[in-house]
């Protein structure tokens, strides 16, 4: 395969993998999760898809990795714009069959793929893994009524302060993504990838709470495969099932790795099985 790096006019850094052969290839754009960068977790899937005959693109959202933008600023609507910017660039590449563009998203990116498809009919096929359906339920679902009211009041006060003063609190990623799985993962990778050791606005919690990928999924008519991990404590499998239920498409499937946790899908036997299932899905529907 041929691997090249590019920087788009919007400031988005991407890596473009193209299989051998002078033909127009179908394309899979891989969309990362919460504060993810393209060199972490994604290459194994990108390489597997490219070896199977698909061109692939991995990229950094603005504000992360090698892309431009305010460091750590995470807004789902902006990240969806980034996906569409990548589609715009990709369809102009001579080696790409621009009638066969698919999206693959993981975790938060597994929600973004529905937001992008709801806005852009050029997307012909979706794979979404380890995603959530409703950010409000994800963030506050285990709180009682008074705890939830107090939590929302605090967020609203912080948002008002930002509006009035322009100042806001920035915290480490694991202050927001505070489950044990994520703490272990981010602690492990930030030593190898210092660009993962960043501060993000605490109000990212509010962005997550207001984000409801199921609403976009209800507008999606293309083929959709949803992958969930049965032991996922970041985005519990019930969230993935709710997302599957919301998908409007008549061509949809739900695949579960019952014994996997959130970060297990990227290596070993879990990865081998999931990548094979996803590759077959793209071969059939893209």
Curated annotation (Swiss-Prot):
Entry keyword Transferase: no
Q: Which residues form the AB hydrolase-1 domain?
A: 26-268
**What domain of life is recorded for the organism?**
Bacteria
Keywords attached to this Swiss-Prot or TrEMBL record, sorted alphabetically, are: Plasmid
Entry-linked PANTHER family? DLTD N-TERMINAL DOMAIN PROTEIN (AFU_ORTHOLOGUE AFUA_8G00380)-RELATED, SUPERFAMILY HYDROLASE, PUTATIVE (AFU_ORTHOLOGUE AFUA_2G16580)-RELATED
Q: Which family does it belong to?
A: To E.coli YcjY.
* Protein name, per record: Uncharacterized 31.7 kDa protein in traX-finO intergenic region
């Amino acid at each position: 395969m041929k691997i090249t790096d590019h920087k788009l006019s919007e400031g988005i850094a991407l890596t473009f993998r193209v299989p051998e052969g002078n033909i127009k290839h179908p394309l899979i754009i891989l969309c990362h999760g919460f504060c993810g960068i393209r060199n972490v977790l994604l290459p194994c899937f990108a390489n597997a898809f490219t070896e199977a005959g698909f061109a692939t693109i991995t990229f950094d959202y603005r504000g992360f990795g090698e892309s431009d933008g305010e460091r750590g600023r995470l807004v789902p609507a902006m990240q969806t714009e980034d996906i569409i910017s990548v589609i715009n660039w990709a369809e102009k590449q001579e080696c790409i069959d621009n009638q066969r563009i698919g999206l693959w998203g993981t975790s938060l990116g597994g929600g973004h793929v529905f937001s992008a498809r709801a806005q852009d009919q050029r997307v012909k096929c979706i794979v979404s893994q380890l995603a959530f359906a409703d950010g409000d339920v994800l963030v506050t679902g285990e709180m009682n009524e008074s705890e939830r009211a107090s939590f929302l009041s605090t967020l609203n006060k912080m948002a008002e302060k930002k509006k009035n003063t322009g100042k806001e609190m920035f915290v480490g990623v694991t202050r927001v993504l505070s489950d044990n799985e994520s703490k272990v993962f981010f602690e492990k990778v930030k030593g190898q990838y210092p660009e993962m050791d960043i501060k993000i606005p605490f109000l990212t919690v509010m962005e997550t709470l207001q984000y409801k990928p199921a609403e976009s999924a209800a507008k999606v008519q293309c083929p959709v495969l949803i992958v969930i991990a049965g032991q996922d404590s970041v985005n519990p499998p019930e969230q993935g099932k709710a997302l599957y239920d919301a998908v409007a498409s008549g061509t949809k499937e739900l695949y579960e790795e019952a014994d996997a946790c959130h970060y297990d899908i990227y290596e070993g036997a879990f990865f081998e099985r999931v990548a094979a299932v996803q590759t077959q899905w793209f071969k059939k529907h893209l």
